[in-house]
Amino acid sequence: MLITSILGPVLTAQFATKLPLPKTREDEENRNIESTLDEWLPQLKNEIKNDHFTVLIPIYNPYTQRDLIEMGALLAKKESGIIVPVSIAAAHVHMDDPQVDGNLKQSQILLDRAIEISQEFEVSAQPIIRIDDDAAQGISRSAKEKNANLIIMGWSENTGLKARLFGTILDTVFWSSHCPVAVMRLLDHPVNLRRILVPIKNLSQATLETIKFAQLFADSNQGIITLLHICDRQTPQEQITEFKTTLSKLITEYELSKECKIKMIIHDSPSQVIIRASHQFDLVVLRSFRRRTAGGLAVSDITTEVLKKIELFFSFIWTTSFMILS
């Protein structure tokens, strides 16, 4: 017993890092990366087969709607697509209630402004007003009805009791939507966001989709993408080199981005690295993995930790815009 307790930690520290990692479900998805990339990437290149690339943008805050419309217009224009501004007017038991008419009038004002902004970017807009007793479901249903390729929403800082008990509109849209959802908090106009940071954990289909989305925005805005991969201190050097080589080959072979840099950092706290590195960029694109559980939507641990720190820094030192792609 004494010998085991003494030698155990020593042997573990020396040999544990050399042992093969157990195969998890995520590993199964990422194995044979060279062969599966050939299957994934053609799908990514041809995934948009609608008549128009459609970006649905819920409008509810007149102070933030310009940046959201501007972002959607940049992406839609790059793909020769359209934007669909949608305003959800709260329903009422009696549809002849004056409050319903007031809600519809306010929605129309917001949509008229959205059309004006879209015209500045020479992008077609198809605004809709939806009467619904659930704003989140109204957004998800509108996106499905319009066969939207992307939903763009603003970041919500609602942390009240109701939000903690029942979740926010963002939580519900993330959980129920059929297409990717981009949630953003922009501290500058989208046309000024050119230095883009994309933290990546591994080479998976989700990673490729995130890079493709960042590329779409970078191409529409003459931006430069930096892919950031953080390794812990126990990662063998040959594994780090192999990852960087494979990623470089992926970028070159499939032309994921013409202006793309790779940065590898060894550190035990990925969230701290992302926070520190973000100050050198205009926009950080984070990935949220949709895992539908009985308790709702679960996001990746690193993204959650970064968001907690972002919330902490918002009021005084946070100076970088960010986007979460689900």
Q: Where in the sequence are the language-model features?
A:
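Active-site charged/polar residues at nucleotide-handling catalytic sites that mediate phosphoryl
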Residues: K146, A277-Q280
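Non-catalytic interaction/regulatory modules that flank or connect domains
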Residues: T54-V93, V100-D101, K105-R113
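Short acidic active-site motifs
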Residues: A135-I139, I169, S269-I274, I302
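Short helix-loop-beta junction
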Residues: A76, R113-V123, L216-N221, S248-E259
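Transmembrane helix-bundle signature of multi-pass membrane transporters/permeases
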Residues: M1-S5
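A short, acidic, amphipathic alpha-helical segment used as a generic capping/interface helix at domain edges
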Residues: T245-K249, I266-S278, A294, V299
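Intrinsically disordered or low-complexity boundary/linker segments at protein termini
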Residues: I6, L11-Q65, S87-H92, N149-Q239, ...
